[in-house]
């Protein structure tokens, strides 16, 4: 470790504000410099958000709010804004007692309980708040949310990846019921068929990304085609975990700010930006393992740590990306997938 990193380590806590232990290779020096700049931004945004929410607790879907969300929701307002813009708050208000009822019914389903319990200890082993012996341990909240959701959405039940999403929602909302309804908004509305048994939506969107790369970053598409690499091997975790454990926590939360407001289109913007930003590095790959390594490398480093700059780039770098374009590509890939599975 160099001297600057050692000095920074004295002032940057080893455990972040969300309970995650920083990895051994963490760049303390860059983070210290970034966070000093970012605190100024956060203070400015907090003042603007407080003014906006004083006028009305209901967050309207207009251009001003869209702009505010793209510039980041301060942590103290994040839970409230996510709940309102996603429709989760309205669902929760209309269904008093539903979450608790689903949990009680779910606890009578041994198959569901086995699946959930198996994954509890695998969820964020690097987070002190999710450890079994933590007091209180968020594992209990996680268990409650996953059991209730598995019972509520019987088509999906429980599948791997959902534990990480529920975990992040619990960290942000600090409330089981809110986490449950936000999960329902994500899985039921925002992410089309990502977690269904056939994972049709997930498979479709990975191929849609391939189409978009072909159009916007043709040299990378050509490289991947030449080496016969399937997109699912490179990006399935980006989609299924919504960048959890792939990008830094604050960057993931900034992406989710936009995801709840603008929908799944944001995932393509993030993926395209990661690939475009590291195009030169990816093009150095000479074979299949090289390409896989490059796709792991592009999710690390200063570019993704500076979440504010990163978010500016995702709305500039990929150029225009209309919902119509994505809908057409989805339909094309969905039909292709169905015909291949016959």
Swiss-Prot record:
tRNA-binding keyword on record: no
Pfam family, one: RabGAP-TBC
MF annotations from Gene Ontology: GTPase activator activity
InterPro entries: Rab-GAP-TBC_dom, Rab-GAP_TBC_sf, Rab_GAP_TBC_domain
Domain of life: Eukaryota
Domain Rab-GAP TBC: 72-263
Sorted UniProt keywords: GTPase activation
Signal sequence coordinates: none
Function: May act as a GTPase-activating protein for Rab family protein(s).
Protein name listed in UniProt: Growth hormone-regulated TBC protein 1
Organism, as annotated: Xenopus tropicalis (Western clawed frog)
């Amino acid at each position: 470790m160099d001297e600057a990193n050692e000095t920074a380590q004295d002032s940057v806590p080893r455990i972040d504000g969300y309970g995650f232990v920083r990895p051994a290779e963490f760049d303390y020096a860059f983070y210290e410099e970034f966070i000093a700049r970012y605190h100024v931004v956060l203070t400015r945004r907090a003042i603007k958000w407080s003014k906006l929410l004083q006028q009305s607790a209901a967050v309207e879907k207009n251009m001003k709010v869209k702009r505010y969300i793209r510039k980041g929701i301060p942590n103290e307002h994040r839970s409230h804004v996510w709940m309102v813009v996603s429709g989760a708050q309205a669902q929760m208000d209309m269904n008093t007692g539903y979450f608790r009822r689903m949990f009680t019914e779910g606890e009578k389903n041994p198959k569901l309980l086995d699946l959930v319990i198996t994954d509890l200890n695998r969820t964020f082993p690097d987070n002190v708040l999710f450890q079994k012996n933590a007091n209180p341990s968020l594992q209990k909240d996680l268990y409650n949310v996953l059991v209730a959701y598995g019972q509520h959405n019987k088509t999906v039940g429980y599948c791997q990846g959902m534990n990480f999403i529920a975990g992040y929602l619990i960290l942000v909302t600090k409330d089981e019921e809110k986490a449950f309804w936000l999960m329902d908004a994500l899985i039921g509305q925002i992410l089309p068929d990502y977690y269904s048994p056939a994972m049709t939506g997930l498979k479709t969107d990975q191929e849609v990304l391939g189409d978009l790369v072909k159009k916007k970053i043709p040299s990378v598409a050509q490289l991947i085609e030449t080496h016969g690499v399937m997109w699912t091997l490179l990006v399935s975790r980006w989609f299924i975990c919504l960048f959890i454990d792939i990008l830094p926590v604050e960057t993931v939360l900034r992406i989710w700010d936009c995801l709840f407001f603008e929908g799944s289109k944001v995932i393509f913007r993030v993926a395209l930006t990661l690939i475009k930003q590291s195009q030169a590095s990816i093009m150095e790959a000479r074979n299949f393992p090289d390409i896989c390594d490059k796709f792991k490398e592009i999710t690390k480093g200063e570019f993704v740590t500076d979440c504010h700059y990163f978010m500016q780039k995702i709305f500039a770098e990929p150029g225009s990306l209309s919902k119509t374009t994505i809908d057409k590509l989805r339909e094309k890939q969905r039909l292709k997938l169905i015909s291949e599975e016959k």
